[in-house]
């Protein structure tokens, strides 16, 4: 016997690298290339840090109300957490307390199985089809809950509302958790379905479309009943998860709708041009509705390309995982950054072709 | 069957009220009456919020290093969390994964049993003696871990290092978690015992002595091995728990040792004067080593006094709980605030005495 016998054994999630080099093109963690609204700067500068001696609002009351108004929901339908990872984690702990398996696509956010291991939640991976599409009919089996990212990471593919409604309808005895971290980049939010389904919980984040990954704000929306249970678990975990500065910066973000929309449109435009350029270079690219693309080249091993990009100080994401080990996920940066990526790829593919020719 | 069947049932912690009134004397959540160092204001004003588009360091690297240096520890012996409540919560999840009960005093921080319920950890409350003292010999029974607050809340009593070492020695097969949230107000930290015991984990916070409850920074110190396990669980829960602003404000706090020490001494001085005044009014007061006092008056029901104080806009803390339902916990505020409390109590006790006289 030793204290080591009482440890919870887990295999933790490994987040995308945050390299300390400064002259890199960082396209590996789906951060927004543009800053948050300047209102955030203003609010932060004006904040009197003497107020930090006091605890923050336990439910980020004012921000919570503003989010409810923004989405035409009741305040009781909203809960804010310390980034969407915390919201997801506490949702798993709250809602998936079943002997039946939680269902999730086999290709999706790799944190889900880690939450399951942490909380001892049985789960079952449901294979997507050869085009990485989620097949609705596969989610009509016995389960203790369902989690789907829409759009998905890393595939970047989105589901339509009709498909999500079908899943909700067929699973009224399970919570269906839809992770909409990337929804603002072209997907269709399922928040309107909250009017009809009390088993729907939708998670969103300030990290991507609102350029606030550094301040850690995630949100879940659901029926007032579902959210009240999530609050009970949150209040059994941490009374004050959102610090006072994060609360005011979140509010600042909501005040500048014009900048928010402009920022998103810029990224979508860059994505579409980047996709066209990739296709012209012979890449296969999924129909991205996110701020990243998922790509594959028939003539180049993804792992080799990943390393070549890394050496050129362009950091993207690659997983050594069945079905996607020949694919790369590339975040959409600025136009200038994406042009540099295309230039690099052109040179790389040309050199590769020459070597192939020479081998013949 | 319904989705409600799969819910985790919990009875959440209820934090001390954060009233929205402005002209109150707020002595109910052990906040510091003085602001944090002015370096925090400076750092915050200068921060460029454009950097918030990027994720923060997953382990608050720079702050972690500074804390290690401050306490003459290795960086691997330090983990930072989103307030000490998160650090405690993740410590329970990591270390107390046993069939044997976790031991804790019966009178202590009331969040501990709530973590146990959340994570299904068996626990056993060990009665303190009639003077609220923790009896070391009672912790030499079979257990899956031990958690003790030093100084304790709400009793305000501290243990000495010899007693803590005795517990560590007798329980080398269990993690002994010492919650030092209030240690800077007169207790003796057990951090030096980390040199000898790899089963010791010490939790501290920026919320009390550093006047930073609003920014949510808690810390655990332990052996490099214990902390690495805590990191594995943290990284299975949330990759980025500390936002970028909290990290720089924590660093600002560590840069102003002079202000920090002065602030603590002021509070201790106010506490000692307040205690003397209370004793002169006939109160029983425990030997506080914290930024609050735990008090009882032989002639007045605590609950009635709590209500009378509340009506006078002086908010303190009372628990309807066996053994302490006739006690109040009062945070140490400014001299001016504590003088007002004494003035109120004088008037209240005098009126009470007159009523008693009249009844005869």
UniProtKB/Swiss-Prot annotation, chains A, B:
It is an enzyme of class 2 (transferase). It holds the Pfam family Aminotran_1_2. It comes from the Bacteria. Its EC number is 2.6.1.9. Keywords: Amino-acid biosynthesis, Aminotransferase, Histidine biosynthesis, Pyridoxal phosphate, Transferase. Its cofactor is pyridoxal 5'-phosphate. The keyword Amino-acid biosynthesis applies. GO terms for biological process: L-histidine biosynthetic process. One of its GO terms (molecular function) is pyridoxal phosphate binding. It catalyses: L-histidinol phosphate + 2-oxoglutarate = 3-(imidazol-4-yl)-2-oxopropyl phosphate + L-glutamate. The modification N6-(pyridoxal phosphate)lysine is found at residue 208. Pathway: Amino-acid biosynthesis; L-histidine biosynthesis; L-histidine from 5-phospho-alpha-D-ribose 1-diphosphate: step 7/9. Gene3D superfamilies: Aspartate Aminotransferase, domain 1, Type I PLP-dependent aspartate aminotransferase-like (Major domain). InterPro entries: Aminotrans_II_pyridoxalP_BS, Aminotransferase_I/II_large, HisP_aminotrans, HistidinolP_aminotransfase, PyrdxlP-dep_Trfase, PyrdxlP-dep_Trfase_major, PyrdxlP-dep_Trfase_small. CDD domains: AAT_like. The keyword rRNA-binding does not apply. Homodimer. HAMAP family: HisC_aminotrans_2 (MF_01023). Belongs to the class-II pyridoxal-phosphate-dependent aminotransferase family. Histidinol-phosphate aminotransferase subfamily. This is Histidinol-phosphate aminotransferase. It comes from Lactococcus lactis subsp. lactis (strain IL1403) (Streptococcus lactis). The gene is hisC.
